[in-house]
UniProtKB/Swiss-Prot annotation:
GTP binds at residues 89-96, 160-164, 214-217. GO terms for biological process: mitochondrial translational elongation. Belongs to the TRAFAC class translation factor GTPase superfamily. Classic translation factor GTPase family. EF-G/EF-2 subfamily. Mitochondrial GTPase that catalyzes the GTP-dependent ribosomal translocation step during translation elongation. During this step, the ribosome changes from the pre-translocational (PRE) to the post-translocational (POST) state as the newly formed A-site-bound peptidyl-tRNA and P-site-bound deacylated tRNA move to the P and E sites, respectively. Catalyzes the coordinated movement of the two tRNA molecules, the mRNA and conformational changes in the ribosome. Residues 1-45 form a transit peptide. Keywords: Elongation factor, GTP-binding, Mitochondrion, Nucleotide-binding, Protein biosynthesis, Transit peptide. It comes from Scheffersomyces stipitis (strain ATCC 58785 / CBS 6054 / NBRC 10063 / NRRL Y-11545) (Yeast). GO terms for molecular function: GTP binding; GTPase activity; translation elongation factor activity. The keyword Cell membrane does not apply. The keyword Mitochondrion applies. This is Elongation factor G, mitochondrial. Signal peptide: none annotated. GO terms for cellular component: mitochondrion.
Length: 775
């Protein structure tokens, strides 16, 4: 585990049941595991106190029930009628189309418009011109709406997220602040690569979900195969709570198998739901799937297990209660089905959100209370309007009135005109304007309470920062979202001399998007941008042109390699610089070894041979070396440096001496430890019509990829493979050529793996040549 306990903290990896507590200045800590909910018993890892997670939702619920006993009735009632949900899925599964129907059926919009701007309008939630042109969601978009169920109006805060892996940070930040989600799965393609990624993200933030199998009107739709894949690939117990009436072009509606009622969408746009008896030809299937639902629930819910074992027939209320408990407990996902494009099956999903997803006070949210002495302790946040305000800034956008900051309120109220404290800086900021977002439209409000999502202007902050009420005696910090590492880079420069607008764009975009990195290379004198993929960087280059009027010249995309070692070695390095007057002297000795995962620095000095302040300088020297390896100048991964001895000079030793000595020892030991270059390996999923299967498999083999799985459908096949990112440049052109433009693919970072010896030699030679040219 590599931890830098100062202003900057990198990815911290710990045993799964533990997550590190860090000083409040590190409120933007990037976490590689669950980041939101934790409990109280606290051992220590490398001097960093950790907090144990409740092992089950039942343990969380004990705390939640105690909190709810203290809440005022008004807060309980407001929370009962509120749901915070996200819509997530693999690209092109129909998320935005689904969201458009949700907004229409809840009365939030007056007309339905389709993705890609086919009618010159485009879907409401895809408000960027680039989104409408490309037909994909690039930024998550927030809105709110109301849904009436059984004469009660429920308030939904809803976020539509991108499906493309290049924009995965939008999913991360949405799930960080949401209480539940609707996972959309294609009835034809089933569980795809990004579905697996979204599932992993939901688990990371403990977000329960209901699943909607979309595109039931398409040829080859098979909802029960998709449910089987959810069980097998996502390892999530799932069962249908509906069966379709008809399929493909004959899709007419769905049967709710819990209460055995057929539901038909009628009206020009499916706005009317007509209930009827179950068609005779479906009664046997309904009973079969109902029995399977009860059996699955008996495996994940104790109350249903008792009913099942006693041979009793559960009531509708008992089945719904079991589904709700198991779903909120993250043990089960109920599956609904329909077609968003055909306007069928959407309203029952809204009912399922009310019935099965949690209200804000059913989720345990926790922060770190920081005392004036600096001592930190976990504290449970109270979803009460009378408690001191606590909110998390989870998304930034540049609006026409300045920076727009999205905030999730966890505790207390936020009022227009009030002041709040930025926990990281201690500054008090005024909430001059408070709005609720409806995609790119804003609606002013005077105050928002616990569980709400809002936005405000003119606040200088970063994603993941915590805010508190200005008059609060407490200081509470909340953990941020997980930020993945960039895998691709390219050089960029403005064509014109308009460096002011170019710099402004760079600063804005890297502030809004933590996965978009900008750095200046002092050797090449170039600005380097890094991101999650070719499309990710391509979008930003286009946005610089459109939003700032700056055309840019870009270099060839470069892979973000890593440097590592494969054998242990020892080091004994002396840094000596004496040329009259005060000199420099530092000697370090120890061991250098490969390590799986992140980097680690440790020391064990007996007898005070190296003073503590010099040891800290050694750790800083180690951190410096990790940024630029000796082989090709890329970041270092998977090394453990342990200092166990050393020597000082009474006059010439200093922090700089030992920092420099450590850097020299690092380089010397690294080159002796059988160094290797690691390249990013991508998980690739390719779909195309069956007649092109041979061509696609041949293309993957030509790229040196390893095929993991091939699934043949009625009309299409899907190949899952692992390929090096280096071989994937220009892949979209090759795939179009061999499938006549009918193939699709998606990429996701999988792991780092050793390059071939030939490629390693070529990369080193190229790097050495570039260095020589600069001399």
């Amino acid at each position: 585990m590599s931890v830098l306990l100062r202003e900057v903290v990198g990815s911290v990896r710990t045993p799964r049941a533990w997550r590190c507590r860090v000083p409040v200045v590190n409120s933007q800590l990037r976490m590689s595991g669950t980041v939101r909910r934790f409990h109280f018993s606290r051992p220590v890892f490398n001097g960093v106190e950790a907090v144990k997670l409740p092992s089950t939702y039942e343990e969380e619920k004990v705390i939640i029930d105690e909190i709810n006993k203290e809440l005022p009735h008004a807060d309980l009632d407001a929370s009962k009628r509120m749901r915070n949900i996200g819509i997530s899925a693999h690209i092109d599964s129909g998320k935005t189309t689904f969201t458009e129907r949700v907004l229409f059926y809840t009365g939030r919009i007056k007309a339905i418009h389709e993705v890609r701007g086919r009618d010159a309008v485009g879907a409401k939630m895809d408000h960027m011109d680039l989104e409408r042109e490309k037909g994909i969601t690039i930024q998550s978009a927030a809105t709110y709406c109301s849904w009436d169920k059984e004469d009660t109006a429920y308030h939904f805060n809803l976020i539509d997220t991108p499906g493309h892996i290049d924009f995965t940070i939008e999913v991360e930040r949405a799930l960080r602040v949401l209480d539940g989600a609707v996972l959309v799965v294609c009835a034809v393609s089933g569980v795809q690569s990004q579905t697996v990624t979204v599932d992993r993200q939901m688990r990371r933030y403990n977000v329960p979900r209901v699943t909607f199998i979309n595109k039931m009107d398409r040829m080859g739709a098979d909802p029960f195969r998709a449910i089987e894949q959810i069980n097998l690939k996502l390892k999530t117990p799932a069962a249908a709570i509906q069966v379709p009436i008809g399929a493909e072009s004959e899709l007419k509606g769905v049967v709710n198998i819990i209460d055995r009622v057929a539901l038909y969408n009628e009206g020009a746009q499916g706005e009317t739901i007509r209930s009827a008896e179950v068609p005779e030809e479906l009664k046997e299937l309904v009973e079969e799937k109902r029995a399977l639902l009860i059996e699955t629930l008996a495996d994940v819910d104790d109350e249903m297990a008792d009913i099942y074992l006693e041979g009793e027939e559960p009531t509708v209320e008992q089945i719904k209660g079991a589904i709700r408990r198991a779903t909120i407990g993250r043990k089960f996902t109920p599956v609904l089905m329909g077609s968003a494009l055909a306007n069928k099956g959407i309203q029952p999903v809204l009912d399922a959100v009310v019935d099965y997803l949690p209200q804000p006070n059913e989720i345990l949210n926790t922060g770190l209370e920081v005392a004036k002495s600096g001592e930190e302790k976990p504290i449970n946040l109270l979803p009460s309007s009378s408690a001191p305000f606590v909110g998390l800034a989870f998304k930034l956008e540049e609006g026409q009135y300045g920076q727009l900051t999205y905030i999730r309120v966890y505790q207390g109220k936020l009022k227009k005109g009030s002041y709040m404290t930025h926990v990281k800086t201690g500054k008090k900021v005024k909430v001059a304007r408070l709005v609720r977002m409806h995609s790119n439209d804003m609606e002013d409000v005077n105050e928002v309470g616990p569980g709400e999502i809002c936005a405000t202007f003119g606040i200088d902050c970063a994603s993941g920062d915590t805010f508190m009420g200005a008059n609060s005696d407490q200081l509470i910090a909340m953990s941020s979202m997980f930020v993945p590492e960039a895998v691709i880079s390219l050089s960029i420069a403005p064509k014109s001399k308009d460096n002011g607008a170019f710099s402004k764009a760079m600063n804005r975009f890297q502030k809004e998007d933590p996965t978009f990195r900008v750095k200046f290379d002092p050797e090449s004198k170039e600005t380097i941008i890094s991101g999650m993929g070719e499309l990710h960087l391509e979008i930003y280059v286009e946005r610089i042109k459109r939003e700032y009027g700056v055309e840019c010249i870009t270099g060839k995309p470069q892979v973000s390699y890593r440097e590592s070692i494969t054998a242990p070695t020892t080091f004994d390095y002396t840094h000596k610089k004496q040329s009259g007057g005060s000199g420099q002297y530092g000697r370090v000795m120890g061991e250098f070894s490969p390590l799986e995962g992140d980097n680690k620095f440790s020391q064990h000095i007996v007898g005070g041979k190296i003073p503590e302040k010099f040891l800290f300088a050694c750790s800083k020297g180690f951190e410096d070396c990790l940024e630029k390896g000796p082989l090709i100048g890329h970041k270092v991964l998977g090394v453990h440096m342990h200092i166990n001895d050393g020597q000082t000079h009474v006059v010439d030793s200093s922090e700089l001496s030992f920092r420099t000595a450590t850097q020299g020892a690092f380089k010397q030991a690294f080159l002796e430890a059988q160094p290797v270059i690691l390249e990013p390996i991508m998980s690739v999923e390719i779909s195309a019509p069956n007649e092109f299967q041979g061509s696609v498999v041949g293309l993957v083999n030509k790229l040196g990829g390893m095929i993991l799985e091939t699934v043949n459908g009625q009309d299409e096949f899907t190949v899952t493979a692992e390929c090096s990112l280096n071989s994937m440049f220009g892949f979209s052109t090759s795939l179009r050529a061999c499938t006549q433009g009918k193939g699709e693919f998606s990429l996701e970072f999988c792991k780092y793996s050793q390059t071939s010896p030939q490629l390693q030699r070529e990369l080193i030679a190229e790097y050495q040549k570039a260095l020589a040219a600069k001399k």
